[in-house]
């Protein structure tokens, strides 16, 4: 009888040890997955921060571009106003993304606003072709060089950001990470894409 009791207690202890071990493994796994998701999400946020720096630089340059053109393009008021309006809308959309880089709707809205801005800049570039004195202006040449350099940096930062988004979303959607992501509200991140396919390339503001 005594031996049976000892055997029963030993079996129960073994079961508890096994269950405890399984629980410990699960806890460690959850912590590891959670930390990995946090690291990838922070990478997305950092990637956006790099884009944001370049976008702000470009938004600051566009008024200089418009101001440099004003003196020559007296009959292109509507074109210049369209650039200013599109710039202001894109800047507001970028500010919304900065508040929450993983907000997919905000990122998509920025993509639309950027498409409109690049379209407006493209129209301005076409209009400038009729003003050779403007094209040769030292002030305009300086602004165009700075703007082109900034556009290239935006494109580079956007690619790095999108790569981070893909890594984060892949981890978030993979099993068993998807379970942890759902438990702790890791929302899907959106890639930063310009909506209008016609203006996805870096806008060219050089004049020859």
Set out the residue ranges of the language-model regions.
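A helix-centric hydrophobic-segment signal that preferentially recognizes long
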Residues: 2-208
């Amino acid at each position: 009888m005594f031996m049976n009791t000892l055997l029963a207690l030993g079996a129960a202890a073994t079961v508890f040890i096994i269950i405890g071990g399984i629980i410990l493994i699960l806890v460690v796994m959850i912590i590891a997955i959670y930390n990995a998701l946090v690291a990838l999400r922070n990478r997305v946020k950092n990637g956006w921060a790099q884009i944001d720096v370049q976008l702000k630089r470009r938004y600051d340059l566009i008024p200089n571009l418009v101001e440099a053109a004003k003196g020559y393009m007296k009959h292109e008021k509507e074109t210049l106003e369209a650039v200013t309006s599109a710039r202001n809308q894109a800047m507001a959309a970028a500010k919304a993304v900065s508040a929450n880089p993983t907000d997919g709707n905000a990122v998509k809205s920025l993509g639309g606003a950027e498409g409109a801005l690049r379209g407006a800049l493209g129209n301005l570039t076409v209009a400038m072709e009729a003003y050779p004195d403007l094209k040769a202006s030292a002030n305009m040449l300086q602004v165009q060089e700075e703007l082109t350099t900034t556009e290239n940096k935006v494109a580079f930062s956007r690619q790095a950001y999108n790569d981070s988004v893909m890594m984060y979303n892949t981890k978030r959607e993979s099993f068993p990470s998807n379970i942890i992501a759902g438990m702790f509200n890791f929302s899907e991140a959106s890639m930063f894409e310009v909506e209008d396919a016609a203006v996805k390339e870096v806008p060219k503001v050089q004049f020859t």
